[in-house]
Amino acid sequence: MIESSQPPFCQADVSGSASVDLFGQPIIKNELLKDRFGEVPFTILDSRSGNWKKRKQKWLKLNIKSEVGRKDFNNSTKANNFANMNNDKYDIGGYHKLNSESGYASIFNPALAELLYNWFLSEGDEILDPFCGGSVRGIVANYLGYKYTGIDIRAEQIESNREQALNILPVNNQPQYYVGDSLIVLDDFKKHYDCIFTCPPYVGLEVYSDLNGDISNMDYDYFINSYKQIIEKSIDKLKVGGWFIIVVGEVRGKDGYYLNFCGKTKDIIINAGCKLYNEMIYITPIGAKAMTANRLMKNKKIGKIHEFVYVFRKV
């Protein structure tokens, strides 16, 4: 249990300096943008930088293990076959980690969650995550002073998330987790949230269970239909003026062509009552991509080392 009255990841004081020179003019401090905002607030978010790696390691020292709870996820089956067919592997807002239970599981980067929360939210804001998956986004949110509610269809994943949160956060500052299909669970939610912050599974590339309602195991057309309905119901629970933040990446179909998943995602959110406010490119580490570049280029495919972060606002 972390016992600290002041979390090490609090937002920087950006109120400016009260110091003045001999002529009464304000003295401008030589302050780096990354020190003021955590990272430079530009449209490129580079997780390969030294500053980013340091921030991520600080979070991992809290013993966040988002891959735990995925022992039924087998990358050697449908997900891996799909990826191998396309000669590619993907991250979703994070990085891959090998563990004995789950094989390679994508882990949401805690430094990305920290950055986006602090850039767009105010202390105490309430967050809804209809595709919560692992523990990262919930633990980071509540550690920073926000209030997170996540939904996942897999009971073992939610059990793991709750256990990790109890080991890291005070008992009176716990993320709220719900087990079930978001299409159904959201119908019972009465409150409205300040932010929706989520990262959906890649269709065909990340299969977490064979449960009915788990969109990760659906064919593309069924996936898009359920995905659309969940997003629409989530936006119904978003306050007017609230933020919808989503991390997504493009995927290829069985014919090798991109499916325009990112474009469809934007259309769904806009048609549900939001407007696109910011768009960022999140660069992931090259890692194993360097070893697959030759194979990819045989099929004229460029190795993908980026995701998109879309920030919408409900109007």
Give the location of each predicted region.
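Class I S-adenosyl-L-methionine-dependent methyltransferase catalytic core
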Residues: 1-315
